[in-house]
Amino acid sequence: RLGIPVLDVPWANSLADVRSITTMLGDELGAPETAKAMLAEMDREIDAARAGAPRPPVSGILYEPNGYASVGGITNEIMTMSGIVDVAPKSQLTRTGTLPVEAVVATAPELLILGGEARVGSARAYTILHHPALQALKGRTTMEFASLTPLLCPGPWSVGAAKTFGDLARKARALAPAKARH
């Protein structure tokens, strides 16, 4: 009514969605070459992630503030290409999408990625990432904090998380023989 153009941009739930939305935005905003360049960089990062991924993949859970477990969607695609198979027990997710810490401990993945800050006290949401029950995983699970900002709003930049995931997966794989000896 006011003559202001509005562009409705859908949420990307997969890398295929990222590709189509980025192309659409490039066309709509008069920057198709920029969109193509962003997608080409995304493809290079995907190729690098796949090439460096440990095989067989390590079992992992991405555990986030307030106890949310990332399951499915673009995050799962990026974890998979980086050599991590998501083993978060979907059947144990609460109706709000959180995963009880007991389920994490019972699953005992090779890799537990704690999405957020390693320091305690910056926000109440982070307290579960420091839950004493997680100490039961020491010696069995590689536990690492990781900032996963590229995943907050899906776009070509989101595959930047693949490097972090890949580095952590390779670390978990390298530490696995040492853990087996103890």
Q: In which residue ranges do the predicted regions lie?
A:
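Extracytoplasmic substrate-binding proteins
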Residues: R1-G67, A88-P89, T141-H182
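Short gly/pro-enriched beta-turn/loop segments at secondary-structure junctions
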Residues: A53-V58, G72-I74, A106-T107
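Acidic/His-rich segments in extracytoplasmic proteins that coordinate ligands and/or metal ions
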Residues: R1-E28, T98-T141
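Short secondary-structure boundary/capping segments
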Residues: A51-A53, N76, L134-Q135
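Internal, well-ordered alpha-helical scaffold/interface segments
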Residues: T23, A40, P65, G73-T80, ...
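Histidine- and/or cysteine-centered catalytic micro-motif in compact active-site loops
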Residues: Y63-N66, S91-Q92, P109, E117
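His/Asp/Glu-enriched short active-site or ligand-binding loop at hydrolase and phosphoryl-transfer sites
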Residues: I74-T96, G116, T141-F145
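Short, solvent-exposed loop/turn elements at domain surfaces
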Residues: G67-I74, L114, G121-S122, L152-P154
